[in-house]
Amino acid sequence: MVYRRTHQVVKRLAARRAAILAAAREAAAEAGMAGVQIAPVAVRANVAAGTVYRYFPSKADLVSELIAAVSRDELAAIRRAADAAPGPSSALAAAITTVAVHTLSQRKLAWGVLAEPVDVDVSASRLASRREIAGEIAARIDAAVRAGHLPAQDTALAATALLGALHEALVGPLAPHGFDNNRAKLRDAVQTVTLFALRAVGLVDARARGLVVQQTVLPAETLIGA
């Protein structure tokens, strides 16, 4: 007789997998990807190390899926914010602001997803993550161009440039410090990079400033893990 998993079994397996990923995410938020090790993650998830390997056959698999999961969450947040905006320019501003807030809210996790050196190959997952988010930003730039709010441009290249600038400024090696538990500095940083990005794609300065002021509302959870 062929064994068929019941609905409850499937739910239990999915919940266990989610718990392992959540534990890995907590570890990365605290210590970067260096903190994502099988045994400590198993302890956090309250499972045996062998159980982690059952779901993720190697550390590379675990870290790659963590990167993918974090990126999916960010992409969903970007789309929600942009879709709620009243027009294409404000949608672009909302998307950029969301990227900045997500990056600053958990800087160690963000750096781990983006570029922190790790002892396993996760380049494919990182590339897919960047490509998806850049594609979403490009779509928002393109919508603003088609509406006549921005000049014609290579939207894919512009989106890639904007993301590179934001990430380098907020979590790269030259990024300033002192954001922890300082909402004023967090807000200033988000406003600065968002204004820079909007100007860079050709939005008139007065309009760009107005959009930045409208968008920069930091949620309480922004400070978690900063």
Where are the regions a protein language model picked out?
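Short coil/turn segments at alpha/beta junctions that flank glycine-rich nucleotide-binding fingerprints
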Residues: 30-34, 106, 147
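Amphipathic alpha-helical packing segments from all-alpha helical-bundle domains
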Residues: 69-75, 121-147, 156-172, 188, ...
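C-terminal peripheral helix-coil segments that are non-catalytic and often amphipathic
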Residues: 1-4, 135, 139-146, 171, ...
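Helix-turn-helix
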Residues: 19, 27-61, 65
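Short linear capping/connector segments at secondary-structure termini
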Residues: 112-120, 213-214
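Hydrophobic alpha-helical connector segments
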Residues: 65, 76-108, 159-162, 187-190, ...
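Generic hydrophobic, amphipathic alpha-helix propensity
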Residues: 13-25, 41, 66-70, 74, ...
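Short, structured helix-loop boundary elements
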Residues: 10, 17-18, 38, 60, ...
